[in-house]
Amino acid sequence: MATDSDNIDRTPRLGPLVDDTTVAEEIDGRDLAIVLSRYDIGSIERIVDYRKGSRRAAKMLVRTSKGSYLLKRRAAGRDDQNQVVFAHAVQHTLSQHRFPVAGLVESLDGNTLIDHDGRTYELFRFIHGHRFDNSNPAAAE
């Protein structure tokens, strides 16, 4: 299993300016228990903060008896339900056409997003990997 230091993303990136002091909110234990109880993912073995990707979205790596998952709470302002549903439809279509995407996990009621206390949560099957290296000129083609 990766250590906490392995989950710190130090990759320089282009995009919205976020200073180094920006820290993702955390998902507290109560919210974590409520949201995860909405999924059939087996018994929980370990949960750790996952700090890669956007620092604005709280993420937790959840290891269970059925596998590893990434729980993500959408950042405020990036959580419009219509946009999330659209993004999930795109991911589903890509998956059906055999594109390698982290699969969304459906909740017990068949949804791919959970609305809890006005916040939007998503659960993905966790895939180990590395950030794309776009420094290779051939990759730009």
Give, region by region, the residue ranges found by the protein language model.
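ATP-binding pocket architecture of kinase catalytic cores
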Residues: 65-141
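Juxta-kinase regulatory segment immediately upstream of eukaryotic protein kinase catalytic domains
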Residues: 2-46
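ATP-binding glycine-rich phosphate-binding loop
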Residues: 39-64
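Broad hydrophobic/π-residue packing in well-ordered secondary structure
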Residues: 24-27, 34-42, 60, 74, ...
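Short secondary-structure boundary/capping elements
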Residues: 27, 51-54, 116
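Short, N-terminal intrinsically disordered low-complexity segments that are rich in Pro/Gly
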Residues: 17-25, 48-51, 73, 77-80
